């Protein structure tokens, strides 16, 4: 078979450009352009279920918690708190008994998830001071509520040198109080590098079964099991922080009501 001539060899392309059909699958290891880590983590979030990998279809959590029935109900709490170094607490499982889409039918319901939206900010005088302040958030489940109001931050948590960043539940209260989620946000004051406010946007799946007594009012004192509390405290001793939050809980009524 005759060989190719020299001019044919030169005119023949060395390599052909192939088009890769890669649909951003998380299972392929490739040298891609640097992207934001959060975008890569949520790459399959907004796609239909049939277009997601089998891992997302097999291990999908049920829409309705076990022992509950629909529809999914929503309760919102709008509040503005003065977060101090000693801490504040809010009960986020207060639901009135009734027949509406924001009410509980009976004594028992399950809070499937919670959505915390808002910001922490400083006023005009505090933000001019050169300091850094962090707000610690503790989403706590009170398994055996007692009294007319929740216990204070210092009564529940044990801290070293009264520092909220080292807060842990006291040993004698560990069977009653359970920290389900913990997060923080940072604000910075001063003439340079100032960050006077910090946005909050957190969504947690908790699946907490709350039990009330025979009363209809949405109060902490009417809880008998699993009250959901949000503790907040700032790390700076002299400069408080303001928290403007909108908290939404998504819950289902229990079948045994």
Curated annotation (Swiss-Prot):
Classification via InterPro entries: Gem_coat_AR1, GV_A/BR1_coat, Viral_coat
Major subcellular site: virion
Subcellular location: Virion
Molecular-function GO term, any one: structural molecule activity
Biological-process GO terms, alphabetical: symbiont entry into host cell; viral penetration into host nucleus
Database matches in Gene3D superfamilies: 2.60.120.20
Annotated Pfam families: Gemini_coat
Domain of life: Viruses
An annotated GO cellular component: T=1 icosahedral viral capsid
Protein family per UniProt: Belongs to the geminiviridae capsid protein family.
Annotated protein name in UniProt: Capsid protein
Organism ancestry: Viruses, Monodnaviria, Shotokuvirae, Cressdnaviricota, Repensiviricetes
């Amino acid at each position: 078979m005759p060989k190719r001539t020299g001019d044919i060899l030169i005119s023949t392309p060395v390599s052909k450009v192939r088009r890769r059909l890669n649909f951003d699958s998380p299972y392929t290891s490739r040298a891609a352009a640097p992207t934001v880590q959060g975008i890569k983590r949520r790459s399959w979030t907004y796609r239909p279920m049939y277009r997601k990998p089998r891992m997302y279809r097999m291990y999908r959590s049920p829409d309705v918690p076990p022992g509950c029935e629909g529809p999914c109900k929503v309760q919102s709490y709008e509040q503005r708190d003065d977060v101090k170094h000693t801490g504040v607490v809010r009960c986020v499982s207060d639901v009135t008994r009734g027949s509406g889409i924001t009410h509980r039918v009976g004594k028992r319901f399950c809070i499937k998830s919670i959505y915390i939206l808002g910001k922490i900010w400083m006023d005009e005088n505090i933000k001019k001071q050169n300091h850094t302040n962090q707000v610690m958030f503790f989403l706590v489940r009170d398994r055996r509520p007692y009294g007319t109001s929740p216990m204070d931050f210092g009564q529940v948590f044990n801290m070293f040198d009264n520092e909220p960043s080292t807060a842990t539940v006291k040993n004698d209260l560990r069977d009653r109080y359970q920290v389900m989620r913990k997060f923080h946000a940072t604000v910075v004051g001063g003439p340079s590098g100032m960050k006077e406010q910090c946005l909050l946007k957190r969504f947690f799946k908790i699946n907490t079964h709350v039990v009330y007594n025979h009363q209809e009012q949405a109060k902490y004192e009417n809880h008998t099991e699993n009250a959901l509390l949000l503790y907040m405290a700032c790390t700076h001793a002299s400069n408080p922080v303001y928290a403007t939050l909108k908290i939404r809980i998504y819950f289902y009524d229990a079948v045994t009501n």
